[in-house]
């Protein structure tokens, strides 16, 4: 009574196919597959970008820390907003 038989699962599958249709289910499956493939490719690229023997450059005691500027970094400053009126 507690477990579902194969017939229960087949009936559920038929109802899902009638509600969503086979085309919609196919689109969902292909979207899910391409998302998983994109995730795996991204993880693979991330591992290739980071060589195994690379380490962070260490600073010497007499030098101030260097600032790294990237073309995509935007330097901003926060201001307090006070109520006027």
Swiss-Prot record:
GO terms for cellular component: TAT protein transport complex. Its main location: membrane. The chain crosses the membrane at residues 1-21. One of its GO terms (molecular function) is protein transmembrane transporter activity. Gene3D superfamilies: 1.20.5.3310. Keywords: Cell inner membrane, Cell membrane, Membrane, Protein transport, Translocation, Transmembrane, Transmembrane helix, Transport. Residues 53-62 have a biased composition (Polar residues). It comes from the Bacteria. Residues 39-85 are annotated as: Disordered. HAMAP family: TatA_E (MF_00236). This is Sec-independent protein translocase protein TatA. The gene is tatA.
């Amino acid at each position: 009574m507690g477990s579902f038989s194969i017939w229960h699962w087949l009936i559920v599958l038929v109802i899902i196919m009638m509600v969503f249709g086979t085309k919609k289910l196919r689109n969902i499956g292909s979207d899910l597959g391409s998302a998983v493939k994109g995730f795996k490719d991204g993880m693979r690229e991330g591992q290739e970008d980071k060589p195994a023997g690379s380490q962070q450059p260490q600073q010497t005691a007499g030098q101030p820390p260097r600032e790294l500027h990237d073309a995509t970094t935007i330097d901003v400053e926060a201001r307090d907003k006070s109520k006027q009126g």
